[in-house]
Curated annotation (Swiss-Prot):
A GO cellular component entry from the record: cytoplasm
Species name: Endomicrobium trichonymphae
Function: Catalyzes the ATP-dependent phosphorylation of N-acetyl-L-glutamate.
Sites marked Transition state stabilizer: 8, 215
Main localization category: cytoplasm
One biological process term in Gene Ontology: L-arginine biosynthetic process
Protein name, per record: Acetylglutamate kinase
Keyword field: Amino-acid biosynthesis, Arginine biosynthesis, ATP-binding, Cytoplasm, Kinase, Nucleotide-binding, Transferase
GO terms, molecular function: acetylglutamate kinase activity; ATP binding
UniProt gene name: argB
HAMAP family in the record: ArgB
Pathway: Amino-acid biosynthesis; L-arginine biosynthesis; N(2)-acetyl-L-ornithine from L-glutamate: step 2/4
EC number of this enzyme: 2.7.2.8
Family: Belongs to the acetylglutamate kinase family. ArgB subfamily.
Amino acid sequence: MSELTVVKFGGSLTENPQAQNKFLEELTLISKRQNIILVHGGGPEINALLEKFAITSRFVNGLRFTDADTLGVVELALSGKVNRVLTTGLIKNGANAVGISGKDGKSVICRQVEYLGFVGEPVKVNRKLIDILIKSRFLPVIASIAADVEGNIMNVNADTLAASIAVAFKAQKLIFLTDVAGVFDKNNNIIKEIKIKEINSLIEDKTITGGMIPKIKGCAESVKKGLKEVWIAEGISGIQKIKGTVIKK
């Protein structure tokens, strides 16, 4: 199996057991005929644990500041809960899933975004560990935690991590599964395909707004770096016959 797809499972989908179970069933089936790398975040679980431990988040320009206490909760939520749930679900469905994070085997090296605390931006993907897993017919399930060159643990945006891994492995496809069905035009219809040259004008005329802007820009960067297609799709609709918006060159 030479074809590789990287799938990013949106944290919000973990709140929908039906969608999550359907996704895990389908991903198991797909993993029988092609290589899969699954990357995940876990915003809702992080928020729930922060509330449980009475840790108040502060935000810088709309982004969560990750102090030492918050980082411990982030790692507990992502590696200790979400990763375990997804890995166990895949195994129950028959997949050879292995749960890791970006820090394991120094798989993802990042640099600190200092104004956000213990938050990292991926700068290098070391393929060795993930390659071993894939070649041994395992399905890596990767939590969005990484480390800098000195081994300091960092919270990493899961979208960015998935894109970095997809580019490093020259994946045929990168799929962002979210709680929205894709990118919509001003008539509320899904835009089926966006060329990267069209993105700036879609942002300028406010077709693409809010949190979709950084996601689309990240998709465009991935395509510029060699990916053939990047999808933004609704997780609840499944991935066997994926429907959503595809970004191409």
